Swiss-Prot record:
Domain of life where this protein originates: Eukaryota
SUPFAM superfamilies, per database record: F-box domain, Galactose oxidase, central domain
Record's protein name: Putative F-box protein At5g60560
UniProt source species: Arabidopsis thaliana (Mouse-ear cress)
Lineage: Eukaryota, Viridiplantae, Streptophyta, Embryophyta, Tracheophyta
Domain F-box: 2-49
Length: 407
């Protein structure tokens, strides 16, 4: 009789590739050989080449998400895309309300809704979870990013760009925060989620004008791309975007292919969604080319309107399609009904709607203003690539956490 431990490594990898990343820990614990193998090799990288693997924040809970964008042909010769699979993370994070999530190098940085003195970093592949203590409580007007330097050492950027600009960096090795000496001549909206690329994070930015009051900054258009370098621990120069985003417009960033960025834009006065991708991205120069442009009005019962931070989207360059997450109004009444949907958009006006989940709102109309961005469904802007990145908790901090919980 063949035992699980007798299976070849290739067959084991084929088996584990069919298991969701968040369930991998439970499966590999059934066999010591599988456990050892998964600790030294990433066993499901091949899976990421054929479908989008990612994480979705829905109703303050973190869910894993699979989305097959390569599809298959039906009898009429048309191409259909498989419906996504969405599952809760199924671990400690289920007990937390997550308001923001960021992704880099196989790690997820989670900002919790209630516990505002600690951040959580999670490696879904290895199952490691690390709690990071903040020097002071955080609030919704702070932005975050996770990345790594040239030595693959991971760090976290935490910043506030309102009234008094402050920038802090957390080093995983020293387990400590440092204040950065940065005097910005630009403004980054902390509600937006940057896009991670090669260990660095890119943001949309506004240029600050001399003697400009804080409340006036938001009325200036977002028209630049700005990179934070985790090696130099500083920001680079401003690079023009292919559009100007004013206060009521929607804009978002995404990364793909390990070396490219995509930018989405929707004017407040239009139902047209435009997406550009970078044709070149270097420290001193960035250039953009159009990728897709689709009018969403014919495909929605009610107005198609993205939140001001652009919500979330991801693209498949090979298939030349984009997936845009949206909240559709199903019926307007005293008990308004909405559904979270994914719009797959392609060339020549192609649009396909995939329902993710339906919900009932008992509080009137859906608010897509700045105050509602935390509970708007978000998908991490790039496909998740598993990694063996280590985030082991230091003994000192773990003992401190146990003492806090005991009290």
């Amino acid at each position: 009789m063949t035992m699980m431990s007798d299976l070849s490594e290739d067959l084991v990898e084929e088996i584990l590739c069919r298991v969701s990343i968040t369930s991998l820990g439970a499966v590999r614990s059934t066999c010591k050989g599988w456990y050892v193998l998964s600790k030294t090799r990433v066993l499901c990288k091949a899976e990421t080449k054929h479908q989008f693997l990612g994480f979705m924040k829905k109703n303050y809970k973190l869910c894993s998400m699979r989305f097959d964008l390569h599809g298959n042909f039906n009898e009429e010769g048309g191409e259909e895309f498989m419906n996504p699979s969405i599952k809760k993370s199924g671990n400690l994070l289920d007990q937390l309300d997550i308001c923001k999530v960021f992704q880099c190098d196989g790690l997820l940085l989670c900002v919790t809704k209630e516990e505002n003195t600690r951040l959580v970093v999670w490696n879904p592949y290895s199952g490691q979870i690390r709690w990071i203590k903040c020097n002071n409580s955080y609030h919704r007007y702070e932005g975050y990013a996770i990345g790594y330097n040239n030595n693959r050492k991971h760090k976290i950027l935490r910043f506030s760009d309102m009234s008094f600009s402050t920038y802090k960096i957390y080093d995983f090795i020293s387990n400590s925060w440092r204040v950065l000496d940065i005097a910005p001549n630009w403004h980054i909206n902390p509600d937006q989620r940057g896009a991670s690329l090669k260990g660095n994070t890119y943001f949309f930015a506004r240029e600050k004008r001399e003697d400009e009051e804080d409340e006036d900054i938001l009325w200036q258009p977002v028209e630049y791309l700005l990179c934070f370098d985790f090696t130099t621990e500083n920001f680079g120069q401003l690079h023009p975007l292919p559009f100007e985003q004013y206060i009521d417009d929607a804009g978002a960033l995404s990364s793909f292919g390990e070396e490219k960025l995509a930018a989405l834009f929707q004017s407040f006065a239009s139902s047209v969604v435009e997406i550009w991708v970078t044709s070149m991205i270097e420290a001193n120069a960035v250039s953009w080319i159009p990728f897709l442009k689709v009018d969403m009005k014919p495909h929605c019962s009610f107005r198609f309107r993205l939140p001001f931070d652009g919500g979330s989207f991801f693209i498949d360059e090979e298939k030349k399609v984009a997936v845009v997450i949206h909240v559709d109004v199903v019926a307007e009444s005293e008990m308004n009904r909405y559904e979270d949907v994914a719009y797959i958009i392609g060339e020549n006006g192609y649009v396909k709607k995939v329902c993710l989940v339906e919900a009932v709102n008992q509080g009137g109309s859906l608010n897509l203003s700045k105050r509602s961005c935390c509970n708007y469904p978000h998908v991490c802007c790039s496909s998740y690539v598993p990694s063996l990145a280590q985030i082991n908790q230091s003994v000192e901090f773990e003992n401190e956490r146990e003492e806090e919980e005991a009290n």
